[in-house]
């Protein structure tokens, strides 16, 4: 989508270390199977109803499984004035790059 900020996973990991927040827009079962530690979980279909819960002063990185749903969330939230970038390739790329993520109760995660 034109005008939407996207970042590769290595950049997203660096930005996360610098204080950017992670917004995971996958479904509950996907999030439970594996997610980036500290991620805020709001499934894509709940974004319109729950956007007000997101810190408007934060810089956000949106993620899903491969990047499509998070791109939609990024476009919507950007129109609302939030500072948000899409993580290219989503959790598949994150996992493929060997970046850390966890499953339920802090155990090993997997991408479904």
Regions found by a protein language model. Give the residues of each.
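Short, surface-exposed ligand- or partner-binding patches at beta-edge/loop junctions that are enriched
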Residues: 63
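Rhodanese-like catalytic fold shared by cysteine-dependent sulfurtransferases
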Residues: 1-21, 27-60, 68-112
């Amino acid at each position: 989508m034109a005008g939407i900020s996207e970042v590769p996973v290595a950049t997203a990991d660096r930005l996360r270390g610098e204080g950017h927040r992670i917004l995971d827009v996958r479904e509950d079962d996907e999030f439970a199977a594996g997610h980036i530690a500290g991620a805020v979980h709001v499934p894509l279909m709940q974004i319109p109803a729950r956007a007000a819960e997101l810190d408007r002063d934060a810089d956000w990185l949106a993620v899903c499984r491969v990047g499509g749903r998070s791109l939609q969330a990024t476009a919507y939230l950007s129109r609302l004035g939030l500072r948000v970038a899409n993580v290219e390739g989503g959790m598949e790329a994150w996992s493929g790059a060997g970046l850390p993520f966890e499953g339920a109760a802090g155990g090993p995660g997997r991408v479904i």
